[in-house]
A protein has these predicted regions:
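Extracellular glycan-modifying ectodomains
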Residues: 1-389
């Protein structure tokens, strides 16, 4: 067969030619495209090319497993391929969940939480006991505010027949335990439900919005006899196109991005290194917001510069408050500047000590434990609130 005949026979397989050219082109693009260390869309670290030294150190199978993962993570157009897959699955297959995230009405996303994990069943009693101990050691000073999940406030937007965890029984038990131990439980479920027609939770993220946090803050002020932060007297700033943690898992093609709102405040934040219990050192002073984070994927990290072990906010009020928190408090704390002169913020993920020495040195007027219910059931570090001495 001459060359002309071979060429003519190949033309009978146009699909084969197209696919061959496609994969050759994709391979070439992979070769010339720089590897990425991090995927902002997925909020995850990407695999890097395994060193040839691993071949002899770990064996052929282990090396090729690592190399296959590297190729998968670094494929050209990875974000676009993931979005295409999501579009096909949600549009053609009518999927109601993706990546462990339930796709609800009004473009809301919910974590697929059908019950407490076995680890959470062990952690929840420990954290409850720790907070009870804190209430008993500082009677009349401890306030506990647990933010309910968005699914608890917007059950009508959860996909039909999804048997999500009912938090109410647990929250009722926690309320009773806190009050019996001499603390105050600030139950915000009713307040948030009353305002559910407003933008209280992000659609694509697991946090509440600054507005949701504000309504919870107002209820705390009512309980403590404080005048709330006046939002009308301050300039509200916004950042659009926020895709949060739920989106990073679900990666739906038609997700509606969120908007972050914060208030332009001149108050200062000092972030400390802590080398011993209650002994902060090497403070770095900055503003309340890390606006550089608005240019990256995790925009919510702008509030309080993320989850620092110990930081102090300079307020405009009087007295001192200690906030023991998860990231739900990050957009809540700025409102407290209207009420207190000093707002100390502890995040046990990065604070490896108990609280008694810090409290003894600072003499707080109030203590606020602010977590989401989800974090309260799973945080392996909150037990430190119950450590005495």
């Amino acid at each position: 067969m001459d060359k002309h005949a071979k060429r003519s026979s190949l033309l009978h397989y146009p699909v084969l030619i197209v696919f061959t050219l496609f994969f050759v082109g994709l391979f070439a693009l992979d070769l010339i495209t720089p590897d990425r260390a991090y995927s902002e869309m997925e909020n995850t670290t990407l695999s890097q090319r395994p060193a040839l030294t691993q071949l002899s150190a770990k064996g052929l199978n282990s090396y090729f497993t690592a190399y296959t993962k590297y190729v998968k993570d670094q494929v050209f157009g990875r974000d676009q391929w993931i979005s295409l897959q999501s579009m096909v699955e949600t549009t053609l297959l009518q999927k109601e969940q993706n990546g462990g995230i339930l796709l609800g009405k009004e473009h809301m996303m919910f974590p697929r939480t059908f019950g407490l994990l076995s680890s959470e069943e062990r952690t929840l009693p420990k954290n409850t006991s720790a907070v009870e101990s804190l209430c008993q050691r500082y009677p009349g000073k401890v306030n506990v505010l647990l933010a309910p999940a968005a699914s608890d406030i917007y059950p009508e937007n959860v996909p039909a027949n999804a048997p999500l965890l009912d938090e109410n029984t647990y929250l009722d038990q926690l309320s009773a335990a806190v009050q019996a131990a001499g603390g105050r439980f600030v139950d915000v479920r009713g307040t948030l439900t009353d305002h559910k027609g407003e933008y209280l939770y992000y659609r694509t993220d697991h946090h509440w919005t600054s507005l949701g946090a504000y309504y919870a803050y107002q209820q705390l002020c009512d309980a403590l006899g404080l005048t709330p932060f006046d939002t009308a007297a301050h300039t509200a700033l916004t950042a659009d196109r926020f895709y949060g943690t739920h989106y990073s898992k679900a990666r739906t093609w038609n997700a509606v991005p969120d908007t972050i709102t914060w208030y332009d405040l001149p108050n200062q934040l000092t972030i400390y290194n802590v080398t011993a219990a209650g002994q902060p050192t090497d403070g770095e002073t900055t503003g309340l917001y890390d606006t550089d984070k608005l240019t990256v994927y995790d925009k919510y990290a702008m509030f309080l510069h993320g989850n620092n072990g110990l930081s102090r906010v300079q307020g405009d009020g009087t007295g001192r408050i200690l906030v023991i928190k998860d990231s739900y408090a990050n957009c809540f704390v700025p409102y407290l500047t209207a009420n207190y002169a000093d707002i100390d913020v502890v995040d046990f993920r990065n604070y490896n000590f108990g609280l008694d020495q810090l409290i003894a040195d600072t003499d707080y007027d109030q203590i606020l434990v602010l977590y989401s219910f989800d974090s309260f059931t799973s945080d392996p570090y909150l037990y430190r609130a119950g450590v005495t001495g």
